[in-house]
Amino acid sequence: GAFAAIGQTNIKRLMAYSSIAHMGYALMGLAAGTAFGLQALLIYMAIYVTMNIGTFAFILSMQKDGKPVTDIASLNMLSRSQPGKALAMLVLLFSLAGVPPMVGFFGKLYVLRAAFDAGLAWLAIAGVIASVIGAFYYLRIVFFMYFGEEQEIGLDVSKSPVMSSFLMASAIIMVVGVANLFGLEGLAAAAAQTLVQ
């Protein structure tokens, strides 16, 4: 999934391919075959779903002259025309890439540690490599939003309060959740113990 997403210019396809890579990370926890591995899986999935809600709310709001747009180049200098929206997406992309201190970083850390502790060091190393590759295509989107070429007519300003709310709420969770993951660690640990008993 990580390799397939590299050359994509369609943001929907890019995110679809990246989803394959993210499922791979989640399955590392399952492959560990331990209670901690299940805990890591549950934490990762909760974080990933939250990130995806915001990301796809952003994608669905991408329109030009009232028509849906999927080309990544259409995001050129979005930070200038819609700074709040661009910043929220930047936070989500950094979190998806696993950049510290975003919550997505801790999600990846959990599954990588679970794999390593279970003696699957090769799998953890493969996960780190895939994460580095993934960071490339996520940061490419950030580049377009902040350093791309100027456009005479940018994307339409979203008029959907629901999509905007999902985007902003997801981004805020990725930042604020760093404090204690909203108690997710304890809940996931309890659920994992129940599942292995």
Predicted regions and their residues:
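Alpha-helical transmembrane segments of multi-pass membrane proteins predominantly involved
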Residues: 1-197
